[in-house]
A protein has these predicted regions:
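Active-site acidic Asp-centered loop
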Residues: 66, 108-110
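Short aromatic/hydrophobic "clamp" motif used to bind/position activated sugar donors
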Residues: 105
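Hydrophobic helical membrane-anchoring modules
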Residues: 1-52, 65-66, 167, 190-264
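Acidic donor-binding segment of Leloir-type glycosyltransferases
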Residues: 50-81
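Acceptor/aglycone-binding surface of glycosyltransferases and processive sugar-polymer synthases
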Residues: 85-99, 116-195, 222-229, 239
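Acidic metal-phosphate-binding loop of nucleotide-sugar-dependent transferases
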Residues: 112-114
Length: 264
């Protein structure tokens, strides 16, 4: 696990301070937001399997874009369906996050590439005082099922840019498996609903000075319709997200000297 803190103290909005009274483990309510994106084919069986794996600590699932015929969830699990994903709009994920009522919110894809069995690990770090916890496929204990060389090279380049813009050393920039406290949603102004969503969430967290932790995550093979990454287009969208949230002094830092820092 790695910890990151934003250097932008002037814009800090910490959601939890060291003087706050910590709640007992398990006393906060937890919502899981599941996204089924356009083009994900027929996710019904994979979604039913995923709902059956949701841990007991999660009491609410907000499902966006899922089929109406998705199977019943376990007893005690409330499922809220927001209907079809309109790809012409850029605020779909934000609407789903706003619909979640839990004190802690977990966001993950419903394509089978992310496992609900990892959710307690994310919640542990939130309960321990972190504001934003994100998964990483590139730290000890994490791994990925399919990551072409061109995509790894692009990710490495974007990490170096992010380190110069934000002064941090994250290892996985756009992986969308993350968890955070409910007040973070009120700080968001999400613009994208594609691959750059993960990067937008991370940059918002850094911008507001939240205490960020990375935890290892295992990316599994998608259970329906394998992904078709478009490296150049996706990279351009993520770069746009990084630049949009950059601190005011970031471009001057970017212009001074070669990139430095450990490989990502």
């Amino acid at each position: 696990m790695s910890e990151q803190r934003s250097p932008m103290s002037g814009d800090s909005h910490p959601l939890r301070r060291s003087t706050d009274r910590a709640s007992l483990p398990g006393t906060r309510t937890v919502s899981l937001v599941l996204t089924v994106r356009p083009g994900d084919g027929r996710p019904g069986a994979a979604l039913d399997r995923l709902l059956g794996q949701v841990p007991a600590s999660v009491r609410e699932v907000v499902l966006i874009g899922g089929p109406a015929e998705a199977g019943a969830a376990r007893d005690g699990l409330r499922v809220v369906r927001l209907g079809d994903w309109d790809s012409t709009r850029g605020d779909i994920p934000h609407a789903a996050l706003l619909a979640a009522t839990g004190d802690l919110i977990v966001l993950m894809n419903a394509d089978g590439s992310m496992s609900p069995h990892e959710i307690p690990h994310y919640l542990h770090y939130l309960e321990s005082g972190y504001d934003f916890v994100k998964g990483s496929r590139f730290i000890a204990g994490g791994d990925y099922a399919d990551y072409p060389l061109s995509r790894r090279v692009g990710h490495h380049a974007l990490l170096r840019i992010a380190r110069r813009l934000y002064g941090q050393h994250l290892t996985d920039l756009w992986y969308g498996f993350c968890a955070f406290r409910r007040p973070f949603v009120d700080l968001l102004d999400l613009r994208g609903d594609g691959v750059e969503l993960g990067a937008e969430l991370v940059t918002h967290a850094l911008h507001y000075g939240l205490r960020v932790a990375e935890v290892p995550s295992l990316e599994l093979p998608r259970r329906h319709d394998p992904s078709h990454p478009r490296t150049i287009r996706d990279g351009a969208r993520i770069l746009g997200a990084l630049l949009h949230e950059r601190p005011h002094n970031a471009l001057s830092r970017l212009a001074h000297g070669p990139f430095r820092g450990p490989s990502g």
